[in-house]
UniProtKB/Swiss-Prot annotation:
Its EC number is 6.3.1.14. It comes from the Eukaryota. This is Diphthine--ammonia ligase. InterPro entries: Diphthami_syn_dom (IPR002761), DPH6/MJ0570 (IPR030662), Rossmann-like_a/b/a_fold (IPR014729). Pathway: Protein modification; peptidyl-diphthamide biosynthesis. Amidase that may catalyze the last step of diphthamide biosynthesis using ammonium and ATP. Diphthamide biosynthesis consists in the conversion of an L-histidine residue in the translation elongation factor (EEF2) to diphthamide. The gene is DPH6. When transfected in S.cerevisiae, able to restore diphthamide biosynthesis in a strain lacking DPH6. The modification Phosphotyrosine is found at Y97.
């Protein structure tokens, strides 16, 4: 099946792409929703649906994968927050509809790779959009054990770094910029102590993927800065803002059903 992957830049959307390919599907394009460039606080958009931290590096992510990238600016807000979503003009979900509608027209995809693990809110809305467009959502991580998933991601050579923290026990000065393999023991410890979701499904942290077996080049962070979003004494919210990045060549093979062709479509 020809598949487009919804990506945030994080580990989950990346690992779900790997699962799609393992299942015999072909990733032919990437799709991403981003905040408006002139929007105040655009690095960390208050959205129920989308991860926006790290969005400045998404173009480089697509270049690393050598795949076409479709990006749409998020124009809507979270208006219909009921359990069952229905089409609602001005809702941010309709931005996803317009994005995937274009991707389907341009790339003739039949399925959408989705990295959802636990959020019914996100799953229901993605399924609503896919049903309206006659697309098949592919969510191989859905309701998987999070400790198992994190272990698999690390053993599958997904190199992702923590770019946002927002939970008790996560310190911006200590943990931002750390990689998954460096954080795994501590995340498991936090899960046992405070009930933190090991994969960050409660919004405890977010990641950005620097390398994985699907990348033809790896992303190198040359410089970044810490931005404090909320200086809570017990659970401060902070994120990394990338300042300089570049791609570095790597010697690796990609699966036979993985085809590459890079261009970016913004609207």
């Amino acid at each position: 099946m020809r598949v487009a992957a919804l990506i945030s830049g994080g580990k989950d959307s990346c690992y779900n792409m790997m699962q799609c390919i393992a299942a015999g599907h072909q990733i032919v394009a990437l799709a991403n929703l981003r905040p408006a460039e002139n929007q105040v606080g655009s690095d960390e958009l208050d959205s129920y649906m989308y991860q926006t931290v790290g969005h400045h590096a998404i173009d480089l992510y697509a270049e690393a994968m050598a795949l076409p990238l479709y990006r749409r600016t998020i124009r809507g807000r979270s208006l219909d927050t009921r359990q069952v979503y229905t089409k609602c003009e001005g809702d941010e979900v309709e931005d996803l509809y317009e994005l995937l509608k274009l991707v389907k027209e341009k790339e003739e995809v039949e399925g959408i790779s989705v990295g959802a693990i636990l959020s019914d809110y996100q799953r229901i809305r993605v399924e609503n959009v896919c049903k309206r467009l006659n697309l098949q959502p592919l969510a191989y991580l859905w309701q998987r054990n999070q400790e198992d998933l994190l272990r698999e991601m690390i053993s599958s050579n997904i190199q992702a770094m923590i770019i946002k923290v927002a939970a008790l026990g996560l310190d911006p000065d200590k943990h931002l910029g750390k990689t998954l393999d460096q954080m795994e023991p501590y995340l498991i410890e936090l899960s046992k102590k405070y009930g933190v979701h090991v994969c960050g499904e409660g919004g405890e942290y977010e990641t950005f993927t620097l390398d994985c077996p699907l990348f033809k080049k790896k992303i190198i962070v040359d410089s970044s800065e810490v931005v404090i979003h909320s200086a809570d004494a017990f659970a401060p919210v902070a994120y990394l803002r990338f300042l300089e990045l570049h791609l570095e060549d790597k010697v690796s093979s990609v699966p036979d059903n993985y085809r590459t062709s890079n261009y970016i479509y913004n609207f």
